[in-house]
Amino acid sequence: GLGSVLGKILKMGANLLGGAPKQ
């Protein structure tokens, strides 16, 4: 669903910024 898509975007954004996914 939409939440899953947003979660993926947030994870990718964190990875691009060099931050480890917090989940």
Curated annotation (Swiss-Prot):
Keyword Cell inner membrane belongs to the record: no
Alphabetized, the UniProt keywords read: Amphibian defense peptide, Antimicrobial, Secreted
GO BP terms in the entry: defense response
**Where located?**
Secreted
Return the GO cellular component terms, semicolon-separated. Answer: extracellular region
Question: Domain of life, per the record?
Answer: Eukaryota
Question: Where is it expressed, tissue-wise?
Answer: Expressed by the skin glands.
Role noted for this protein: Antimicrobial peptide.
**Record family assignment:** Belongs to the gastrin/cholecystokinin family.
Name of the protein in its database record: Caerulein precursor fragment R6
> Origin organism of this chain?
Xenopus ruwenzoriensis
